[in-house]
Each structure stands twice: as C-alpha cells, then as structure tokens.
C-alpha cells in the first residue's frame, strides 16, 4: 500500500513538472506570436508610410508640426502610439527591452518625435502623454 502511494505521489510530481514546462512553453509561444504580430504591423505599408513621414518632416518645434498637412500630422500620432505601446509592453515585462531595441529604431524615433511630444504635453497640459515611449528611450540609453 505504501509503495502504491509513493508511486502515485511520484507520478503526480512528474505530471506537475511536465504541466509547468508546457505552460512555460505556451507562454513563450504566445509572447513570440505577439512580437511577430507587432513586427508585421510595424512593417505594414501604412505604418512604414507614417514612419517615412516622421523621418522626412524633420520638425524642430511643435509649430513646425502644426504647419504640416493633416495626413502628416496623423503620422506623428501613429508612430507615437506605436512606441508608446512598445514602452508599455516593456514596462509590464511582456517583451524585453532588448527585443524592442533589436527590432525597432527607438532612439531615432524619439529624436524625430521629441518636438511633437513636448508640444502635445504643453498644449494639452498632460505630462503623461507618451511617457512610456520616453521611459523606453531612456531605458535603452542607460543600458
């Protein structure tokens, strides 16, 4: 009887270990899937067009941003939202800062977007606008 109980306990321990390993693998696959979807989104024609607009606009102030056509202004909001989302994912440890750094040009995005972010914060009185994007930028700088 004791031998049977010991075997049952051993089997339960093996099952628990295997289940834990399976859950870890499922979590890794889900994260990898999310990262690939983000990357696919970031490489869509719409986002790439927005990225090109932000890079070529070369704004040096919020006033420069306001002079842009509305479609170009929307590009800044799109890229800002993308990097804000990436910052939140890093802060919540859903993706690592290393993955974001490997896959996206965060520093270039921040430098191109800084006048826009400062202007949005001032205009709307909301210091938290694009805060996760800024923290992501700072985290990469201090790595």
Describe each model-derived feature in a short phrase.
Residues 66:
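Short glycine/proline- and acidic residue-enriched helix-loop micro-motifs
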Residues 60-63, 107-108:
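Intrinsically disordered cytosolic tails
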Residues 1-60, 70:
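Membrane-proximal alpha-helical anchors
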Residues 69-143:
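An amphipathic alpha-helical interaction surface
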